[in-house]
Amino acid sequence: MTIEQAMELIHGVAWRGSRPGLARVRELLHRLGDPQDGLQFVHIAGTNGKGSTAAMLASILRAAGYTTGLFTSPYLERFAERMQVNGVPVPDAEFAAVCEALQPCIAAMDDPPTEFELVTAAAMLWFRRRGCDVVVLEVGLGGRLDATNVIAAPACAVITNIGLDHTEILGDTLEQIAREKAGILKPGTRAVSYPQTPEVRAVLHEICAQRGIPLTEADAAAIVPLTDGVDGQTFTYRGAEYTLPLLGAHQLRNAAVALETVTALRARGWRIPDAAVRAGLAQVRWPARFELLRRAPWFVLDGGHNPQCAQTGAGNLARYFPGRRITLLVGVLADKDYPAMLAALDGQAAAYIAATPLSPRALPAAELGDYLKRFGKPVTVCADPAQAAELALAHAAPEDVICAVGSLYMAGAIRMDLRRDHNENSGH
């Protein structure tokens, strides 16, 4: 099977969409020989910060000498990013071979799997074939009925920041959403949580008590920021000092979650030296999360796509670029709460460019442009995200800031274009 045929299989029309329930993925994995049963997991659910926390933990575990799988979604530039071993995305030939093994199993099923279930099963088989010591597994959506929840009790279950997103599927209160996410908490695991709101904290404590699961919550008060700038930050947590290249105060809280997860894993006998923890955090890379792509003019890429992310992004712009003229390059999905996102960001914007993310769920740039006019600032409409980025750069003074925000589906196109441009101009 070629990589093209493999992608055709994965993106096949028969299994579009998201249909909650674990029966299909269970059957598919069983037909594959249950590869997940031979793996150890750190399972991560939450609204925001899942990917960043997963990247930190994978980096730390790798630095500690473990062969580490990482499963995340969505991808930015290439599908292969969704499954990595030791920081390297799945090679085309290996992914094609895994998909070839899937094909007869799918054909034998009466109820065909969804695309996400296929990708999850493919990843499990690949991680098993690669002999991973541990897999850092990010939930796709929710937790309880997510395809990743097919695993037995993980070494550690992590709940990152919980907010309102995907309310049409997960429920429209924080308590309902917390119950869905807490579906990954299985007897026999240890749980670690982000510093949550009181109603979320109450749900997690109740469920962990019912299931006999030890729960640790990261302590925001134990984080002491030391230095902070566009190249990264240093901080102490519970007295130990760390360097983190990811920007924003929220990343310090995500790092605290990763550090508490290390403590939970050590309690289960995992050998993770302090030096590996420091090196893992210092080396972590997680693109399109308030990522600085250019200087003079400054170009920041932030894939945040809900009101909570937008508030964080606005705070980061104020923190790192006070007093500068900021153009917001915005692209959103029509089913997101973009009015609340834009209300949170508007205080930082001098001008707007509206673009259309590369997704069938995208809000067309022209419609977004009309909406943005209510803020009374200059609005330009340029549907193609990469062209919109070029336009913004062409009109910016060296000290100005452009921040592309609103959707990971837009971030990938812009990142690819700007990096290609940079490589061409620098002779790489």
Q: Predicted segment positions?
A:
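Short, high-confidence coil segments that cap the C-terminus of an alpha-helix
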Residues: 131-133, 323, 397-399
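Beta-strand->loop->alpha-helix junctions that form or flank phosphate-binding loops
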Residues: 74, 194-195, 207-229, 245-249, ...
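C-terminal helical cap/extension that packs against the catalytic core
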Residues: 194-216, 230-232, 298-301, 307, ...
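N-terminal leader/targeting and accessory segments in enzymes
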Residues: 1-48, 52-67, 76-78, 190-193, ...
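Nucleotide phosphate-binding/pyrophosphate-handling subdomain across enzymes
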Residues: 38, 134-137, 145-158, 162-163, ...
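ATP-dependent carboxylate-amine ligase catalytic core
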Residues: 18, 22, 26-37, 63-152, ...
